[in-house]
Amino acid sequence: MEIVSDKKISEKGIASAAELLYKGAKMLAHSCPECKMPLFEKDGKIFCPSCGREVVIEEDSAAKAESEEKPPESTKPAVKADYDEAVEKIEMAISKVCDMMVESRSVEEVRVLSDSLEKLVDALKKLRE
């Protein structure tokens, strides 16, 4: 597991990500260039749930040309990799929320974190079904 940034992912960002997964948004393998939170896609838009920034992902021209020349291979391994990455990111978020709950001194904060944790666990269960 690689830590991409020293910045702490905000509680609001985690709750927002959990809610998006619950509502059917797709977590992407790319992260926000600003806050390093995983990007999400919903209704054809790619955005960061933490900072609300809409993002455009560009392929480099060499990779694009190569993909146009090659006939499409089976997408099963790519789908499996995306699935595994989504599961791993949700598990990381669950771990971070648990750590935040342990460190919390506020009952209200624990309640909010508990709600976020419940949504993340539900999303993980749905992915594994």
From Swiss-Prot:
It comes from the Archaea. Pfam families: Auto_anti-p27. InterPro entries: SSSCA1, UPF0148, UPF0148_domain. Residues 61-80 are annotated as: Disordered. Signal peptide: none annotated. Disulfide bonds: none annotated. Belongs to the UPF0148 family. HAMAP family: UPF0148. This is UPF0148 protein AF_2370.
